[in-house]
């Protein structure tokens, strides 16, 4: 070993003439460890897109407003005393301090109406006529599109590797998929030709099982997008065959090697989310790469089935096992920030909302539906200026009283 090191030192000694003939070849060898990879990095930092974050700031207010909706409508005569708000809001886990629920309702006079009870002479709260109309329009829109909801649920169950999905997981994501409250009857039991409810073998959970897979429903939303791109923009068929619509957020750094990696990934073949891959050998590196791209296609299709092209990351995780999705979903989605966007606005950063980027343009859904439009009417009421609302004298005194208490504290 000593002899080897001595000879190596003599060879690399710059004072010796022999080094001039060997050093160039050494430089060529040293280039390899520092060469850039042409694969998409596994770990990437999240780049904020303020358009989606601002959208979620409004959604955060709407989420609390909807909870108060349900609270008020559950009371007799659909009214509630202001004095009971603190206790009931604490039970709902809304995170309000003392007197904050009443102050919150005052911010949205187009949704909540505070008035003095004519007999008891105490303040009560009820929904405004505009808010009640919005609830009625959304309810009617959900009922009118039950045939579409049946199709969405069929496609969702068809994506499962077992042909069944837990009923409770669908119930939790009912609002995102535009299903009515009684979907177990109106969507599942009312269509026995498509679904059947079965009990779990080891648990008491119920499962939604598909009766028969329909090949006509196995066409993904991204395939229709590719056809439009091919026909309208004249893009080469080979370039668009396995590609996704990629639109990176502002400020996302795209280097030369990253661009090459995306170019290679766009042309990588993959299995359809509706294809049964249980009999395939997935041990090779190429099969693993195809499986990862299939996971992107599964999440893309899952978001395409939602009414607003968005869903929380936590609810995607419910379908992880039945759709063969990766364990670390957040890190996986951050690899594809040109396709998806994860917003952490809402619930103090604990809630992660995943958007399908191609589904939105300038803060609005590209292809709006009746349910989405009905829900946006509530957003308009929330964002409407309080100055345009008619506020009676008793309400003004109540608001001034809250301000005085804040000053004392």
From Swiss-Prot:
Q: The organism sits in which domain of life? A: Eukaryota
An example GO BP is: lateral root morphogenesis
InterPro entries for the chain: PORR_domain (IPR021099), PORR_fam (IPR045040)
Q: Where is the signal peptide?
A: none
For the null mutant, the annotation states: Embryo lethal when homozygous.
Q: What sequence ranges are listed for the domain PORR?
A: 47-386
Q: Name one GO molecular function term.
A: RNA binding
Tissues expressed in:
Expressed in roots, hypocotyls, cotyledons and shoot apex.
According to its UniProt entry, what is the function of this protein? Answer: Involved in pre-arranging the maintenance of the active cell proliferation during root primordium development. Does not seem to be involved in cell cycle progression.
Q: What is this protein called?
A: Protein ROOT PRIMORDIUM DEFECTIVE 1
């Amino acid at each position: 070993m000593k002899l080897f090191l001595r000879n190596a030192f003599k060879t690399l000694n710059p004072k010796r003439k022999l080094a001039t003939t060997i050093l160039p070849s050494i430089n060529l060898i040293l280039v390899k460890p520092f060469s850039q990879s042409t694969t998409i990095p596994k770990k990437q930092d999240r780049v904020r897109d303020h358009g989606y974050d601002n959208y979620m700031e409004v959604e955060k207010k709407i989420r609390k407003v909807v909870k108060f909706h349900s609270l008020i409508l559950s009371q007799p005569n659909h009214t509630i005393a202001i004095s009971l708000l603190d206790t009931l809001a604490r039970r709902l886990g809304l995170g309000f301090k003392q007197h904050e629920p009443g102050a919150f309702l005052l911010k949205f006079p187009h949704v909540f109406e505070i008035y003095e009870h004519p007999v008891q002479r105490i303040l009560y709260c009820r929904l405004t006529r505009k808010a009640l109309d919005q609830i009625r329009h959304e309810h009617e829109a959900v009922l009118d599109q039950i045939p579409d909801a049946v199709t969405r649920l069929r496609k969702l169950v068809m994506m499962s590797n077992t042909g069944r999905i837990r009923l409770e997981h669908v119930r939790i994501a009912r609002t995102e998929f535009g299903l009515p409250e009684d979907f177990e009857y109106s969507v599942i039991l009312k269509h026995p030709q498509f679904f059947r409810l079965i009990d779990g073998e080891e648990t008491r959970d119920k499962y939604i099982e598909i009766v028969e897979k329909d090949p006509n429903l196995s066409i993904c939303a991204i395939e229709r997008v590719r056809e439009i791109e091919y026909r309208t923009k004249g893009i080469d068929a080979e370039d668009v065959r396995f590609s996704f619509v990629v639109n990176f957020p502002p400020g996302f750094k795209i280097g030369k090697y990253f661009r090459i990696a995306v170019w290679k990934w766009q042309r990588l073949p993959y299995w359809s989310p509706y294809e049964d891959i249980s009999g395939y050998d997935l041990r090779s590196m190429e099969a693993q790469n195809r499986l990862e791209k299939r996971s992107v296609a599964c999440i893309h299709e899952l978001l395409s089935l939602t009414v607003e092209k968005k869903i929380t990351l936590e609810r995607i995780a419910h379908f992880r096992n039945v759709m063969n999705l990766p364990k670390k979903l957040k890190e996986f989605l951050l690899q594809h920030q040109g396709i998806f966007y994860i917003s952490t606005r809402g619930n103090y950063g604990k809630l992660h909302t995943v958007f399908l980027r191609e589904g939105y343009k300038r803060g609005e859904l590209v292809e709006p539906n009746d349910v989405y439009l009905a829900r946006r009417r509530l957003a308009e009421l929330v964002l409407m200026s309080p100055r345009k609302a008619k506020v009676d004298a008793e309400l003004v005194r109540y608001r001034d009283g809250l301000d005085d208490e804040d000053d004392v504290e």
